[in-house]
């Protein structure tokens, strides 16, 4: 023992053993051990109390460390198997070719300032600004390249539930929604002044998205079972879509703003035509609430068409061919927009919270309450090709892709969150994603 422990460590261990025997009323054993170890009479009752429980704490601590070691060894084995499965030529190509980029295992930046869970994030379409909304009722603006907090926006009376940048070219606005029943518009060119507050929903507003970057139209989804379309230049609601859903949780527009897909608490997903405010398809198949939904970009059509059994991919100009949805049933489903289920992706261990397509169209990224980011390869029938475990310390609530680089300004003016409105075949894009979590942190992965 003396060769492993120092004298002071050995003394502490001996006294902890005597204290443990005393605490379980094994007086005879305790006294015998004291004599054997030469612990004198100065080890009185007060000193004994000091060492009570220490042995159990060390024992349980060792057990926790052993479990952690086993988890880490399992993760190392999994990562090594993943690495071994990729030929060296392919690995080097992945670093050179943005089309095959997957996020690193660890984040490039971690932003910490919020005092409650992160619910939503959004990238500025031109500048290196990233907005984050939280249950702490604030919005924070970060420089995601420098990793610095720029400002904090206050105005909502309840938690912020959704964010999006958009508006006409040259006049980008930030829209936010909240459990306080309002939508607020913030002007980055005026130090993010709150220039307008939109009223009309009768319950919590779950999500906001700009329809396109060339119009002043904004869509919102709410717990009041309605979807509203707003003219941000006037603040008026120009169209209301109602349904039997008890609570819309998410809404997403097609890249041309002609279609909407929305999901909610009734387990159903509905595709709506914006011009007529009429439903065009119902996507039925999830076994629990639908947390997120998104139209697939045209770049993914060739892969999704193959999954759907089609010999030919739809035209890139078509804006509403395929949809991805994520649910509390722990699955991701890929659909034809007309309502046919083509694939269910299984792998997450908890609610799916957010989805984003790789701009190349080859991959779909997902985040979940299981604290992972998962990357699904659509060119391999949706095979799970990468998992970033413990990407956050708590539930991951949202994910967004950075917009195109500044030198692609013409394209950037025609994008929303990295997806081109003009659907070019080879759009320029940045290999950057951001995630937000219930751990109150925002992380940027490169």
UniProtKB/Swiss-Prot annotation:
Main location: cytoplasm
Any GO MF annotation of the entry: dynein complex binding
SUPFAM superfamilies: Lissencephaly-1 protein (Lis-1, PAF-AH alpha) N-terminal domain, WD40 repeat-like
Sequence ranges of the WD repeats: 113-154, 156-196, 200-240, 243-282, 285-345, 347-386, 391-430, 432-446
GO cellular component labels: cytoplasm; microtubule; microtubule associated complex; spindle pole
Domain LisH per the UniProt entry, residue ranges: 9-41
Coiled-coil stretches noted in the UniProt entry, renumbered to this chain: 60-86
Entry keyword set: Cell cycle, Cell division, Coiled coil, Cytoplasm, Cytoskeleton, Microtubule, Mitosis, Repeat, Transport, WD repeat
Record's signal peptide: none
GO biological process, one term: microtubule sliding
Localisation: Cytoplasm, Cytoskeleton; Cytoplasm, Cytoskeleton, Spindle pole
Subunit structure comment from the entry: Self-associates. Interacts with nudE and dynein.
Domain notes: Dimerization mediated by the LisH domain may be required to activate dynein.
PANTHER family hit by this protein: F-BOX AND WD REPEAT DOMAIN CONTAINING 7, WD40 REPEAT PROTEIN
Family indicated by similarity: Belongs to the WD repeat LIS1/nudF family.
Summary of the function given for this chain in its UniProt record: Positively regulates the activity of the minus-end directed microtubule motor protein dynein. May enhance dynein-mediated microtubule sliding by targeting dynein to the microtubule plus end. Required for nuclear migration during vegetative growth as well as development. Required for retrograde early endosome (EE) transport from the hyphal tip. Required for localization of dynein to the mitotic spindle poles. Recruits additional proteins to the dynein complex at SPBs.
Name assigned to this protein: Nuclear distribution protein nudF
Provenance organism: Aspergillus terreus (strain NIH 2624 / FGSC A1156)
Taxonomic classification: Eukaryota, Fungi, Dikarya, Ascomycota, Pezizomycotina
